[in-house]
Amino acid sequence: MAHHENQTNCNDERGICSLDSDADDQKQKKRKPLEIYTFIDPLCPECWAFEPILKKLQVEYGQYFRIRFIVAGKLEAWNLCRGKYKGAQSREDLAHVWRKITETFGMPCDGDVWLEDPITSSYTPSLAIKAAELQGPQAGVRFLRKLREHLFLNKQNVTKEDILISCAQRAGLDVKEFKQDLHSKGAAKALRCDMQTTKEMDVDLVPTFVFFNDNVDEEGIKVTGHYPYHIYVQILEDMLGFKPERQPPMSLEHFLKKYEFVASIEVAVVFDLEIDEAEKQLKKLVLKQKLELVPMKYGNFWRYLE
């Protein structure tokens, strides 16, 4: 079994402290001229609501950038409601905020978890994300997605270890290794590095994105919150110094096979469709027994079956 206690590193040129990537990831970094540091909190519904735009950016321009998730662990869970939704203090307020975010951005998000099994801290799920990343960057991405599904869709308290283990299983992680890493010095050190990076980059709200190119002397571009899709494409162009070429369109079935479990809004955003049209096309694949419809409280999800 791999031992991960010291697999962290700091980029002194940028002031970034983060996990070592595996060899394949290092090769990918060399091929891609940009990096996007994505500051999140696992309890943040607005971070979850950004998934459709992030997928569209990856599908259309993913050849130009690599994403690094930074857990903004210093931010208090209550502070996630600031910005557009100031003043939320009680559990009822938080549940209402989550419903409003669903209405605003379209990504299903069930705030009843605050009424049924309230969460007291984002520390444990943040630590779990770092533990998952010790099995590789893509393992961390898969785990983060499953953790969000458990929280925002299934109203499960992601501070509980049995729920985190379920996330690890569904993400295809080595569960025995994950359980050990969850209590390891390596995961704790990685989280401390993320907290330090958050502080050094003066990030006080999530989601926040910092775009870097391969010129370490050039400052990154920091963007906090949600903007129209074309703004992010323009930032890519500014950082690259040329107009990026959009990748050939991905078929709907290829997209579903790649991501396996997606919301109607994710399909609609990626393929520039209205929700009704997106669901019409998705239902055709259900009839072909290639998809399963999974209704949620505030919207539909679709699971790929082949």
Swiss-Prot record:
Task: Please tell me one Gene Ontology term that the record gives under cellular component.
Answer: cytoplasm
**Keywords in alphabetical order:** Cytoplasm
Q: Which Pfam families match?
A: Thioredoxin_5
- Note the InterPro entries from the entry: Adapter_SpxH, Thioredoxin-like_sf
Give the UniProt subcellular location, in the record's own words.
Cytoplasm
Please give the superkingdom of this protein's source: Bacteria
Q: Does the keyword Zinc apply?
A: no
Q: According to its UniProt record, where is this protein mainly located? A: cytoplasm
Q: Which HAMAP family did the record assign?
A: Adapter_SpxH
Describe, as the record does, how this protein assembles with itself and its partners. Interacts with Spx.
What family classification does the UniProt entry report for this protein? Belongs to the SpxH family.
Described purpose of this protein according to its UniProt entry: Adapter protein required for efficient degradation of Spx by ClpXP under non-stress conditions. Interaction with Spx stabilizes Spx and exposes the C-terminus of Spx for recognition and proteolysis by ClpXP.
Q: What is this protein called?
A: ClpXP adapter protein SpxH
Write down the species. Halalkalibacterium halodurans (strain ATCC BAA-125 / DSM 18197 / FERM 7344 / JCM 9153 / C-125) (Bacillus halodurans)
Gene that this polypeptide is encoded by: spxH
